[in-house]
Amino acid sequence: MSLPEHLGGHKNITHLDEGALDHMIRILNVKSMLDIGCGPGGMVGLASSKGLEAYGIDGDFTVERNKDIENSIIIHDYEKGPSKFDKEVDLVWSVEFLEHVWEKYQDNYMKDFQRGKFVIVTYAPVGKAGHHHVNCNTQEYWIDVFKKYGFSYDANMTRMIREASTMGRMKSNKTTGKKFWWKDFVKQNGLCFVKL
């Protein structure tokens, strides 16, 4: 069976963010995590290596995942309905996921976000090109969506997580020599929410 077009945008790459995860462990005593849209599962593996009970959900059934975490990953396509994930966790992590799922399927994945006390997500702004980007939106839009599902946006925690983020790398423009962060999704568009 071939992979549906709307899945697999991760290209077998996990965008790790040890800085943000360490901050959540240190400041909020996070002991468990769910990564929604985990791709190959790198953040699940990183969290597990730090002693967290870690899980992931991703729709791509073609990815070869590390044997150490494969039993912690649920293969699920949110276009088919809610997942069967049934645990409560301290942190729900979701990087480069929201913009890939049609708005009409929000109820399906928000049930899993509601399993966390804290949420860290990234979003793609309006007009951001990418594989199956079908719900690129503003920060305000996502704050309203999470509020509707029982979360409060935490501006202070968002600032701290963006500062703590180690995702991405510094690159230089070949023409101007100007340095910039590349693939720094959390620094640019990370948002933090607390369950009410």
Where do the PLM segments sit?
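Conserved N-terminal segment of class I S-adenosyl-L-methionine
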Residues: M1-V95, K104-Q114, A129, N135-Y141, ...
